[in-house]
Amino acid sequence: MISKADVVVGLAWGDEAKGKITSYLASKLDRDGRPHYSLVARWAGGNNAGHTVYVNGRRYKTHLVPSGVFHGISSLVGPACVLHPESFQGELDYLANEGFDTSLVKVHPNCHIVKDEFLDFDKQNLAEKLGTTSRGIAPSYAAKAGRTGILAKDVLSKDLLWNGELKGNVLCEGAQGVWLDLDQGNYPYVTSSTTLPYGACSLGFPTQKIDRVWGAAKIYDTRSGEDPLFPQSLLDNPELSRLGQIGQEYGVTTGRRRKVNWLNLDLLCRSVSLTGATDVVISKCDVLSELGVFKLYYKGDLISFNTIGEMKSHVFASVTQCSNLVQSITFSSSPEGI
């Protein structure tokens, strides 16, 4: 029986270091020296997501395989995910060649399959209009909703399929972010699945089992794909362009240059409240420090600060005021940990 579930969720538009946070949490040991979590599970999305993880100083990039594999923990691709078999196998081969035990990675039998024809449809009809990753995600979820999809149990070999049960402590690794949620985001410039913590329950446990919700954000905002909230003109702003260069803001999945803007603190506070985040990790503070310009949007105004310390204090006070569920706020300056 499952003891508890901790959920890692993005508080913005994705690319908030959820993989880093998940890897950090997955590395934790109990007093007896055993891993704190018995399972790390992806609960939504497909290989449109990109997670960057550092292990022993080396960088690894994944798309669908959960981050538990980096720490010898069973890892599950859940039933609400969508999976392209060839791409998934390529990711497993990559990790196996790097020395990781990919036999720990399993796929839920009810996970839906991304067919090649969905990739073609995505490229021809959605990529330019909405800025999708052309990974066939939307057509796959459309087929699922229309009950014409294909399940993993009908395609994948039995050795890849999960036949276990949820037990112990489960770490749920989210994809994308709150403002890409199908219902809460700026529709139609959204993803095709839920990105809110309750979506983790699709793994097969009640909401009462959710213990901590780790919310991931950055000290500035970034966006991949099309969205009127992030106009093309942002790419021409010298300070923001420099910030993107320092932060290496290019998509893990597509390699596309991300649009960068100053932190919208009002939206961050809304996403903290919406997700019920108990622990907030704000990354890339080292990047903003290197730029030496400290700005954010607050109540509709662009505010400047003399130091990053002043800016952090303002963010801390605002976030703690917007939700009484927040127990910790961490400002991270390391790509490898929190």
Residue ranges and their predicted role:
Residues 1-338:
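Non-transmembrane, aqueous-exposed alpha-helical and coiled segments at domain scale
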